[in-house]
A protein has these predicted regions:
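Soluble "head" domains of membrane/secretory-pathway proteins
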Residues: 13, 18-19, 31-226
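Membrane-proximal juxtamembrane linkers immediately C-terminal to transmembrane helices
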Residues: 25-31
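A short acidic/basic microdomain associated with nuclease active sites
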Residues: 22
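Hydrophobic membrane-insertion alpha-helices, especially the h-region
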Residues: 1-13
Length: 226
């Protein structure tokens, strides 16, 4: 029993399980999928990450209250988290990255490099959705990331929150960036249902993105969709 408890405690420090609550990451993640997040792993441009709501992105939604047994199981990492104050998106921009939409061909660019997103964007009958119907042009500040859902037409992500109201003294558009300190970790794959079990890899298109300039302390928002 002691060995099982120790094992569970170690697992709780290293890994957390999450249930996907929405369609914003389809087709990569479906509603009800169980994903595994590694808490101690670094993440990179192109990774799928879970993060705490950085600024009322979820509106009035709040975490439900689960029973004590469930809470212990979640803490130990043996039951998927039932919290509703976390989101899952794909990292498009890391600190210093210049992210813009869109080219004449309709592609998002990172540091001037167009992304070929066909491998992960939501698709219907093999036809991917447009990378973004919203125009934006930003430089990601130090200590933050820029995230998008794979189902771009059904995802309230960094694009939308560039238009959020900000506190006095903050740069307009600051609400569109997620503090790295709010990131739980990268989601490494789906473990349930078993017929969808898979391990995630960073899409090949991100390997062509050049290194960014040094990240500014404050975001640069050249264009936002509002």
């Amino acid at each position: 029993v002691v060995a099982l408890i120790i094992s569970a405690l170690i697992r709780s420090l290293l890994m957390q399980l999450y249930v996907i609550p929405s369609a914003s990451m389809e087709n990569t993640l479906q509603i009800g999928d169980r994903g595994a997040v590694i808490k101690v792993a670094d993440f990179h441009r192109g990774d799928v990450v879970v993060f705490k709501d950085p600024g009322n992105w979820l509106g009035n939604e709040t975490s439900g209250t689960s029973n004590p047994v469930r809470q212990v199981a979640e803490f130990l990492g043996v039951a998927p988290s039932s919290a509703t104050d976390h989101l899952v998106k794909r990292v498009i921009g890391m600190p210093g990255d210049h992210v813009a939409c869109c080219t004449a061909q309709g592609q998002i660019t990172v540091n001037g490099q167009p992304l070929d997103e066909a491998s992960y964007l939501y698709s219907v009958n093999g036809v991917s959705v447009h990378p973004s119907d919203l125009s934006f042009d930003v430089v990601v500040p130090a200590g933050h990331i820029f995230v998008l859902g794979d189902h771009r037409n059904d995802s309230r992500d960094s694009r939308y929150h560039l238009c959020d109201a900000v506190e006095s003294g903050e740069v307009a558009g600051s609400g569109g960036f997620v503090p790295i300190s709010d990131v739980t970790g990268p989601m490494v794959g789906i473990f349930m249902p078993f017929n969808r079990a898979t391990r995630f890899a960073i899409p090949a298109t991100f390997a062509s993105v050049p290194d960014p300039a040094p990240a500014p302390d404050q975001p640069t928002v050249n264009r936002k969709p509002c």
